[in-house]
């Protein structure tokens, strides 16, 4: 009796075998069979499960190293078998970000920028700040041939003036409050202390100011829905009295620091992240091309680094774990992890 087996027609009794690798595939979305690989790479957030869905994405995220090579091989196990739908990669080497602190015109700390990725390769990211083409600042961020440019970065939040019965009035702004003052016969009174936590948008703040007799505020541009908390350029107590039309002698409250932070953290720029320093009064000063520094690929990997990665995988829906290590202590930790997850953790796992 003849039979077809593994693409061959067998006509005589014989022993035949084939490699069956279908078990490594996600057969359907409802069937969990996902591989997690732990190893060293030159890109990616450390000690964090990274869900990857293609070789191209893996190369973009992991950059290089044994972890990338293993993921590439897992996505393309053979020319005859399609790869899995997803692979979870965990970078075991505790790399650090590169960073730089931007200063304001008074040499005070203004914005802290850090590389979005981790590793020594990010020390070649550089940033430049110059005057905007028509207003504000022009910020350029570059790594290799990739350049992102944000131009005319300036932001007016709201305009306020006083036209009441008092002799004069003033406004002060900090990260958590807007304070209104009035002065009559040389006696100053605090009219209102507006807690930004209670008025979290620019429109909320403007409405609250307008509730005080003699004070008038208007939102500038499309900023009404933006957050007011720790985003306003701080301002010391400043006179905002204007009792003559067209009432242009008041004060404009700005966010020239925050607008740069928002641009850096948006999808318009993908190399660095930014954080505004507390109590800033203005945006950053101009800066010639300057590099970020401090990024490393981390110290030598230890057993605790692997156990940290295994801990992070406890909440992930994976069924197979491959640690790229020949260390017996690492494999002992993986064995303990699989035993725990397959019983107490109620997520059956195997390692190889």
Language model: regions and residue ranges:
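Surface-exposed assembly/interface segments
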Residues: 1-352
